[in-house]
Amino acid sequence: MGQKVHPNGIRLGIVKAWNSTWYANTKEFADNLDSDFKVRQFLTKELAKASVSRIVIERPAKSIRVTIHTARPGIVIGKKGEDVEKLRKVVADIAGVPAQINIAEVRKPELDAKLVADSITSQLERRVMFRRAMKRAVQNAMRLGAKGIKVEVSGRLGGAEIARTEWYREGRVPLHTLRADIDYNTSEAHTTYGVIGVKVWIFKGEILGGMAAVEQPEPAAQPKKQQRKGRK
């Protein structure tokens, strides 16, 4: 059987950034890793309906900074920022250091593999036909400018006795081109027949220049020069 390397793992440090960025000595490493896991577990459960794409954790100077990438920032922030303040306090308790939470909006959820996979699983749980859900996700992604997309579902599809795997692809998805910007993620649909797994690969184009091109900061807005009034 042909085994495939994880599309995100093979591109780390080339065109993909890590979801946790911090340095620690041998003694602190395990504690930091454990608290990262618990923070992610808590936020994923708490923000299940907020369309969270990814959670990035940084640890600058005995503190923790969490960036939540979401398609629905209003749900995360809450009325006058009440909800995000509650999250901040719990995260600080879990990590044992002062916490800061930033919210980043996902502008095009149709081009985010995690959000596409979650959308398909929610449709499968509502008993939508799996082929229709797959085709709709593929069409939406291609319409918004994806170079290619592949969706795979596996399990007791349509309540069949024997589990099987089906996939649908449009465009090109070059899994072994390291400079290819491929967003990959998975999700699980818990149906009455059992669990159905969903995998999504979205190819957004090739990144030339490696991590330098990915992490290039946006140019700061320049202050407008005041025009001198001409003499009359």
Curated annotation (Swiss-Prot):
Belongs to the universal ribosomal protein uS3 family. The lineage of its organism: Bacteria, Pseudomonadati, Pseudomonadota, Gammaproteobacteria, Enterobacterales. InterPro entries: KH_dom, KH_dom-like_a/b, KH_dom_type_2, KH_sf_prok-type, Ribosomal_S3_C_sf, Ribosomal_uS3_bac-typ, Ribosomal_uS3_C, Ribosomal_uS3_CS. GO terms for cellular component: cytosolic small ribosomal subunit. This is Small ribosomal subunit protein uS3. Residues 39-107 form the KH type-2 domain. Keywords: Ribonucleoprotein, Ribosomal protein, RNA-binding, rRNA-binding. GO terms for molecular function: mRNA binding; rRNA binding; structural constituent of ribosome. One of its GO terms (biological process) is translation.
